[in-house]
Regions:
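Catalytic active-site module of serine/aspartate enzymes centered on a nucleophile-bearing elbow/loop
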Residues: 447-450, 456, 488-547
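N-terminal cap/lid segment of alpha/beta-hydrolase-fold proteins
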Residues: 25-70
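Short, surface-exposed "cap/lid" segments of acyl-processing enzymes
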Residues: 67-133, 138
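Conserved alpha/beta-hydrolase "acid-adjacent" motif
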Residues: 89, 470-479
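Gly/Ala-rich beta-loop-alpha elbow adjacent to hydrolase catalytic centers
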Residues: 194-199, 203
Length: 547
């Protein structure tokens, strides 16, 4: 197996409290390595376009957060899968916090799905290394050359038509490639799998998946993990139930997901129409604008981290003006870099709820209005036309805006997945309703979705919902309980009594579940996960056996 990794010490110093150099000049307690692991299976080719996944993309990708100095033994490894349009950077704050809590007795591995290999991070890396975010703007939007390289732009969808086959099976086999780096004898006792949003569904899919030739041979995912962690996602049922006819060749149909409109194609349409292979192309938005939003977020986050109190000039960048106008209805206001990030991602201003956090509020005149871009959604907007400078206050925050800006500033990963494959959404929705086949004759099993072992999945589960997020009640988690047998080590007691813990975090948005400030409460999500992992792990893992 070919493994590529980079020790990221040289770029970790920007993470406050969890970096190679802290504010007092001492060595930080967290190291990060970026891994790309060659997979040992073949992704099918697009049978219509006759295109195959290139060999350079046949890698599973993750980032390993571990303590410095590295201990000889670990109590557990937590592996985290991001959600829809999410990248490994979503877990940056959570990973560093959990690693530091026990001084290294828990490692965290954050998954970047293989589409991250399509990203060109040259401009962001140069911007960070020079502490000059304007370099990223010049590289991505003005044709600037960095180290002899110019930005080639968004890949033409005709050149990535092979992504029609990047569905559930490939995603879970990539995840299994990562988990398989840990020796078998430690997995069922010391490896925990979690996910956020759609990633929570993928985590429970993995637990119920069969990687063998079922029923002749079985290789269930739950035998590789000690527990499952659901973060504002998962449970039973995703959006609605899909028929086989809709999946294979149905007409296009529209869904509303937290204010964003998706027009979802069938499998045959994804294969026939290259423009539909990435989910950004399905939004009721101009695709380049939506992809620019991801770049905009990272650059504005870097400005907010490096120069929080300086007046922002990113608002006036031509490529971003359309985004600012769509979100805020005003491009003439002045704001500090930190306030600009708040305007971009705080729940008062961001109309797409799955991309918002509770960061505080702006200091300056505001108005409440209905978003012109997302009908029916009420947001706040700045009203001043440049006579004063908006600043940011953190009163009432749940997520620390500095933690969010640090995660957005990552240049070894991203907080978003620009090229999220549509096929993975299609497969995930197909598993809605009763959530997964129970027989090999089920059409979903026949289409390669081998989520067959819910009735045998005995790993313990802990689930978190956001009171202002996606899972606002316990209902979908309770429905999931009904699919599962008693948990291991629960002496046959039903899941309602043992082996399934549910917490709804009051007023948390979808991102607050990941980024909530641990200083606000000792009973925060990070601490609850850490303590739950220690309660459910057995023995230890020698770090000498890890990659």
């Amino acid at each position: 197996m070919k493994i590529k990794f980079v020790l990221l010490v040289s770029i970790m110093f920007f993470i406050l409290g969890a970096c190679s150099t802290s504010n007092n000049g001492q060595t930080s307690p967290v190291n990060i390595k970026h891994y790309e692991v060659q997979t040992n299976f073949t992704v099918p080719k697009n049978p219509v376009q006759d295109t195959s996944t290139p060999a350079q993309l046949d890698y599973a990708v993750f980032n390993r957060y571990y303590y410095n100095p590295e201990p000889a033994q670990l109590r557990a490894i937590l592996i985290l899968m991001p959600g829809l349009f999410g990248g490994a950077g979503d877990f940056d704050k959570m990973a560093k916090t959990i690693v530091q809590m026990g001084k290294g007795d828990v490692e965290v591995w954050t998954v970047d799905r293989r589409s991250s290999l399509l990203n060109d991070l040259t401009g962001l890396q140069a911007a960070w290394n020079s502490h000059d975010p304007s370099l990223a703007i010049s590289y991505y939007f003005s044709g600037a050359t960095i180290d002899g390289k110019t930005y080639a732009g968004t890949p033409q969808t005709t050149s990535i038509s092979y992504m029609s086959e990047w569905g559930l099976d490939m995603t879970l086999r990539d995840l299994n490639t990562i988990i398989s780096l840990i020796p078998q004898q430690y997995r069922e006792t010391n490896v925990f799998l979690g996910g956020h949003s759609l990633g929570a569904f993928l985590a429970q899919d993995y637990a119920a998946y069969d990687f063998g030739d079922y029923p002749t041979t079985t290789d269930p995912g739950y035998k590789n993990i000690a527990g499952v962690i659901l973060l504002d996602g998962g449970g039973s049922g995703l959006f609605f139930t899909m028929s086989e006819a809709q999946y294979l060749s149905g007409t296009w149909f529209t869904m509303n997901i937290s204010g964003a409109q998706f027009t979802l194609p069938s499998l045959s349409m994804i294969r026939q129409n290259p423009s539909s292979v990435i989910a950004a192309g399905l939004l009721d938005l101009i695709e380049p604008m939506f992809l620019n939003m991801f770049t905009f977020a990272q650059i504005i986050g870097m400005y907010a981290f490096l120069e929080p109190n300086q007046i922002s000039n990113i608002i006036q960048v031509n490529q971003f003006k359309i985004i600012v106008a769509a979100l805020l209805g005003n491009t003439q206001f002045k704001a500090t870099n930190q306030a600009a990030l708040g305007f971009a991602m705080d729940r008062h201003f961001m109309p797409i709820s799955i991309f918002s956090a509770t960061l505080g509020n702006a200091n300056g005149p505001l108005t409440s209005t209905t978003s012109s871009f997302f009908s029916g959604i009420t947001i706040s907007q700045p009203t001043d036309k440049g006579t004063m400078v908006y600043t940011w206050n953190t009163q009432g925050h749940i997520t620390n805006i500095t933690d969010l800006s640090a995660a957005l500033s990552n240049t070894y990963t991203t907080i978003s997945e620009r090229y999220f494959p549509t096929r993975l959404i299609l497969d995930s929705i197909a598993l809605g309703g009763d959530y997964g086949p129970t027989q090999t004759t089920d059409w979903r099993y026949q289409q390669g979705m081998h989520v067959i072992h819910n009735a045998q999945m005995d790993a313990p589960v802990i689930a978190f919902g956001g009171g202002a997020g996606v899972e606002t009640t316990t209902t979908v988690f309770e429905q999931y309980i009904g699919l599962l047998p008693p948990a291991r080590n629960c002496n046959g007691e039903p899941r309602t009594m043992c082996g399934f813990d549910i917490y709804i975090m009051p007023n948390y948005t979808h991102l607050d579940v990941l980024f909530s400030d641990p200083e606000l409460s000792s009973n925060n999500v990070d601490a609850m996960i850490y303590n739950w992992i220690l309660d459910h792990s057995t023995g230890s893992i020698p770090t000498s056996v890890l990659p």
